[in-house]
């Protein structure tokens, strides 16, 4: 018990309390924070995130939202040959009808929130990745932790 308290005190004095309370090893902690420096070029939405206690949760959420975005936008692109406001809007009402009920709920929530910006991106000829990054749903280039 005394050893643990001493280690806790030493870590606090060294100015790294996040490492102590997250129970990460120093090597893993450095890898977990490494993407924050690299993302300024490839993913601006993560460059603004600071090192916080729930870093892994935020990264996992971004990954799931990003995959959802890519899937929906790619399905929309397949459904629409020449994207116009009307054709994308019609396809958007059909895209969430396929799949399981959980997927439908996720898809409907996504479309309710982002449909206008996704439509603008498709009409402008952007790729699915560009649209999802514009929505600030990008994931780190180092991959999931």
UniProtKB/Swiss-Prot annotation:
GO biological process entries: antimicrobial humoral immune response mediated by antimicrobial peptide; cellular defense response; defense response to bacterium; defense response to fungus; killing of cells of another organism
Entry superkingdom: Eukaryota
Protein modification: A 9 kDa form is produced by proteolytic processing of a 15 kDa protein.
Signal peptide: 1-22
InterPro entries named in the record: Granulysin-like, SapB_2, Saposin-like, SaposinB_dom
Disulfide bonds, paired cysteine numbers: 69-132, 96-107
UniProt entry keywords in alphabetical sequence: Antibiotic, Antimicrobial, Disulfide bond, Fungicide, Secreted, Signal
GO cellular component terms listed in the entry, alphabetical order: extracellular region; extracellular space; phagocytic vesicle lumen
Residues covered by the Saposin B-type domain: 62-142
SUPFAM superfamilies: Saposin
Residue runs in coiled coils: none
Matches recorded under SMART domains: SapB
Entry's localization field: Secreted
Induction: By T-cell growth factor and IL2/interleukin-2.
Pfam hit, one: SapB_2
Tissue localization of expression: Expressed in natural killer and T-cells.
Purpose: Antimicrobial protein that kills intracellular pathogens. Active against a broad range of microbes, including Gram-positive and Gram-negative bacteria, fungi, and parasites. Kills Mycobacterium tuberculosis.
Protein name: Granulysin
Organism for this UniProt entry: Homo sapiens
Gene: GNLY
């Amino acid at each position: 018990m005394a050893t643990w308290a001493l280690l806790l005190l030493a870590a606090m004095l060294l100015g790294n309390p996040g490492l102590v309370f997250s129970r990460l090893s120093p090597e893993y902690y450095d890898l977990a924070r490494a993407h924050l420096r690299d993302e300024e070029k490839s993913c601006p939405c993560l460059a603004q995130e600071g090192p916080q206690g729930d870093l892994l949760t935020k990264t996992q959420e971004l990954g799931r939202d990003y995959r959802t975005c890519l899937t929906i936008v790619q399905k929309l692109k397949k459904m629409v040959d020449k994207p116009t406001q009307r054709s994308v809007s019609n396809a958007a009402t059909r895209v969430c009808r396929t799949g399981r009920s959980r997927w439908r709920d996720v898809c409907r929530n996504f479309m309710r929130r982002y449909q206008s910006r996704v439509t603008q991106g498709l009409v402008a000829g952007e790729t699915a990745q560009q649209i999802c990054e514009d929505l600030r749903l990008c994931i780190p280039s180092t991959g999931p932790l």
